[in-house]
């Protein structure tokens, strides 16, 4: 980021762990004042304390509009909003309870919509909204119907928001990571057969680190990306060029991780 980014006000949802935490650290390191918002109050508070003042923490459930509205009201005007909140489950379409499908969509898509709704109101002119989609938005992943559908929806939501927010020069983009070393991917990456299959189909031959994603988000939030909006940036070592691992073949082993 450039010096002009110093003292910008940033909000990171899902910022207490994994990719969200790496992004919060990166923004703080670039001189932004960061609010970490997460369902896990204790974790968010601990992370904000780790960053030190003037950074802050707030509790939020992105599926509950009232808590998102209260969060944005308390934080005030913003320059950057990064939405990373999400989770996944696994199962065959014909066996998955509708409630489990809805739960993933509620967080990963509906929650992202609610965050975007209030970000569009609260961001200053020239601000930046970045969401985290997934490789699943591009490659069909048997066994991950809910997550894949939600993340594909988020990719299109990003482009629609980019058009709607453009009159105020608010840029809306997303990053689309592949497998990254985080708690979210643990159920997949700790099954050797799945991990080997994934790496064999990843041209750069490695998993991502949270900082790989954070670095891309920092760029999208910076003045260097001032002419970039509506972009969904593939960030997966080239995995989107090949195929997704066969999750269904290893469901039993994944459930035990």
Segments from the language model and where they lie:
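Substrate-binding pocket helix/loop in short-chain dehydrogenase/reductase
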Residues: 92-93, 100-105, 198
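Active-site loop immediately N-terminal to the catalytic Tyr-X3-Lys motif
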Residues: 94, 139-145, 167, 205, ...
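Active-site helix of classical SDR
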Residues: 116, 150, 158
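Alpha-helical segment proximal to the catalytic Tyr-Lys
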Residues: 121-122, 163-167, 226
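Residue(s) in the substrate-gating loop at a strand-loop-helix junction
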Residues: 134
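C-terminal helical subdomain
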Residues: 174, 193-228, 235-237
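Short C-terminal tail/terminal secondary-structure segment
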Residues: 229-257
